[in-house]
Amino acid sequence: LPSRPGRGCIALQNDEIPEPKRMSPLSSAPANATRVAPPLEAARSYPAKPADVYLFGTCVIDVFFPGAGMDAIRLLEREGIRVHFPQAQSCCGQPAYTSGYTDEAREVARAQLALFAGDWPVVIPSGSCAGMFRHHYFELFKDEPETLQQVASLSARTFELAEFLLEVCKVRFEHTGAPVRLALHTSCSARREMNTHLHGRALLAQLAGVERVEHDHESECCGFGGSFSVRMPEISGAMVQDKTAALKGSGAAEVVSADCGCLLNINGCFEKQGDTLRGEHLASFLLRRTTSASTGGVR
């Protein structure tokens, strides 16, 4: 994200893709093996709205969609929350982790644990990175009992942005723009790992002028999958072509998603096809199109 923080945002100071390592097949795990991480998301209890939060910006937002990160900050500030952005934050470690570079991923994760060690919630405008914080750090540090305590704390304090706005801030948005037909793409991580795919829908449902249209590939992957799109470009390309065809076929005038990795792939395909349709992050759409009734109509 730009070094220039948003109003009230507190900046806390402090091209080659390697071949994936071979990993043992799941079938080779011992029969009595136990899962280190908690089960994937079920119903969870939510805290009261805090005065302060951390924002984890994500690599893709930092490099390709910095405006989405700034808009996420502004949405949180609009709800009266002070946003703290540790300047030394980097990657969540997922690219290395999913490529089999466990040791390298662990060191990246260890740095994030140190940066987000306070008691504040950690808000992440990405289901993918939030899933790494909330679930996969348990596996990375399964042999470090003392570190697992930090992991458990971080996991419990991690929220995807739409989830946090809806469940913790209890936002009530009012639509201020012209009526629009819109398609929502939910990432695989939000849908299958975090169980936050309905939160974006619920936020959009508050907006009387927004008609969310379903598309034929509503629950299917866009083909990004991080480094999967580079390692398996033919398969990824076929998947994103199916996705963009479905989005265009829905008749939507706008496309939104809560994950910028998906937007990177979807928008790249639109551009290659010569189509003018582009997707934007949910945070940017909400900031552009709403006022907040929960904070006295602040835009």
What do the predicted segments below correspond to?
Residues 19-299:
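Iron-sulfur cluster-binding electron-transfer modules in prokaryotic oxidoreductases
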Residues 14-17:
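Polybasic, lysine-rich low-complexity intrinsically disordered segments
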Residues 1-3:
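Ser/Thr/Pro/Gly-rich low-complexity, intrinsically disordered segments
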